[in-house]
Structure formats: C-alpha cells, structure tokens
C-alpha cells in the first residue's frame, strides 16, 4: 500500500514538470476529459477480465485502473488520504 503513496508523489511531480516523452504528462496535458476517457476504458477492461475469470488479466487491468484513478485524483486535487478517510468514515 505504501507504493500507492509513492506513486501519488510521482504523479504530482509529473503534473508539475510535464516532461516530454511521458505518458503520464501526456494525460495531464490532455486534461480531465482525456483522463476520464482512460478511466472509463480501464474500468471496462476490468469488467471483461473479471467476467473471463482470468486472475492474471484482472490483476493487470485493476493495476491500470488504479493508476488512472490516481491520475484523476491528482488532476482534481484530491489525495489518497482523503479517499481513505472517506472509506474509514463509511466503514467504522
């Protein structure tokens, strides 16, 4: 789980620096519409992988979805900590 926090910091830096030849920077340059398109695509791929009962494919696709959700959170100025706090409120 610690890696997700590290990834959040990496994504924030990519958004700030917008390096050339960076897929993540390209997402940020494309704005929220491009990011949302990728989130939607990845969510669909998760559904298909789960429907196919393919654990390896599902692991890969969930990782892609989590990555793109984190990009969306950074774009929207939200942190993983805020999401964790919301989940904690709901389930404690």
UniProtKB/Swiss-Prot annotation:
Cross-referenced Pfam families: PRA-PH (PF01503)
Subcellular location, record wording: Cytoplasm
Keyword ATP-binding applies: yes
EC code(s) of this entry: 3.6.1.31
Main location: cytoplasm
Disulfide pattern: none
Mitochondrion in keyword set: no
Record InterPro entries: HisE, PRib-ATP_PPHydrolase-like
Keyword field: Amino-acid biosynthesis, ATP-binding, Cytoplasm, Histidine biosynthesis, Hydrolase, Nucleotide-binding
Associated pathway: Amino-acid biosynthesis; L-histidine biosynthesis; L-histidine from 5-phospho-alpha-D-ribose 1-diphosphate: step 2/9
Catalytic activity: 1-(5-phospho-beta-D-ribosyl)-ATP + H2O = 1-(5-phospho-beta-D-ribosyl)-5'-AMP + diphosphate + H(+)
A molecular function (GO) term: ATP binding
GO cellular component: cytoplasm
GO biological process terms, semicolon-separated: L-histidine biosynthetic process
Top EC category: hydrolase
Family per similarity comment: Belongs to the PRA-PH family.
PANTHER family found in the cross-reference section: HISTIDINE BIOSYNTHESIS BIFUNCTIONAL PROTEIN, HISTIDINE BIOSYNTHESIS BIFUNCTIONAL PROTEIN HISIE
Protein name: Phosphoribosyl-ATP pyrophosphatase
Organism: Leptospira interrogans serogroup Icterohaemorrhagiae serovar Lai (strain 56601)
Organismal lineage: Bacteria, Pseudomonadati, Spirochaetota, Spirochaetia, Leptospirales
């Amino acid at each position: 789980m610690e890696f997700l926090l590290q990834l959040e910091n990496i994504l924030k830096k990519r958004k700030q620096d917008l390096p050339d030849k960076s897929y993540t920077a390209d997402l940020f340059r494309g704005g929220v519409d491009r990011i949302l398109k990728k989130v939607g695509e990845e969510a669909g791929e998760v559904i298909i992988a789960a429907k196919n009962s393919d654990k390896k494919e599902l692991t890969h696709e969930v990782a892609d979805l989590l990555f793109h959700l984190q990009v969306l959170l950074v774009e929207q100025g939200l942190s993983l900590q805020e999401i964790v706090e919301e989940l904690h409120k709901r389930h404690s």
